[in-house]
């Protein structure tokens, strides 16, 4: 069974976290079929040991002897343990050649591998395939780093090739890691992961994350950005409206988003007709005239034309028509 463990909370040590938001974040992870979540001792103390049920709890704990202080935690990560019992040994891997050392690993040793950020950028495909084969044989929890901007791809490919594999990720990839939401959707699209489950709660997870960190996720962030389904280009709009699957690997509703046609300097007649249809006015206004007005305003303001501005243009067209009729 594929397992995804989210370690976002370990990356928020410097933020003024609130218990209610952390609890809500964990509950939302569980609703998204995330297998487990990782805490630090500080976050555990903030939660007062009151951990939501339904997911497996892990903790980053350098000293294994202190594990008795944290009831409710199922497993502990440490670089100073043998990987047996309740402990998972953390190993940093900086080069694919170091994976050969995993061949001597005993079956009862639990491992987590961090690093491997350059696994996908080798010129030889054979090197990558040998590395992936060694990973599958050892079956560690894979926690790739994102220095080469391919951690999410490495994590997803590991799960695609190893259907009993486990990866560790963070929301939006915070902390230079693979992004939880990207790995979930990659597995949904490629492997039909949880085919009967909706991931619309990802939008809720985004909102909770923003509240916890007092930040705003950029609009075009993959999977969870608010603007990833905003379309402007005339040809693009025409194609998406005719057959969305040609342009979108998953429907916006799957992740709690919605598609929106944006008016701007790259718009075409299809965009204008689409907007007019939204207002049930598709046969009432000259499309080419409105399109010219939209492009002029977009260039002038250096951005998109809002719905309010478009309605103003429609009113101006009405005034123009009345003036011509009276002249």
Name every feature range the model reports, one short phrase each.
Residues 1-18, 88-90, 130-139:
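N-terminal small/glycine-rich loop or linker at the start of catalytic domains
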Residues 4-6, 55, 60-64, 68, ...:
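Active-site pocket-lining/capping segments in soluble small-molecule metabolic enzymes
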Residues 6, 28-63, 252-327:
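Terminal or standalone catalytic/regulatory effector modules within metabolic enzymes
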Residues 14, 18-21, 29-32, 40-41, ...:
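Short, structured segments at the rim of ligand-binding sites
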Residues 15, 148, 173, 192-195, ...:
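Hydrophobic alpha-helical scaffolding
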Residues 18-28, 95-104, 150-156:
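Short, acidic/polar
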Residues 119-246:
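Catalytic alpha/beta core domains of metabolic enzymes, predominantly
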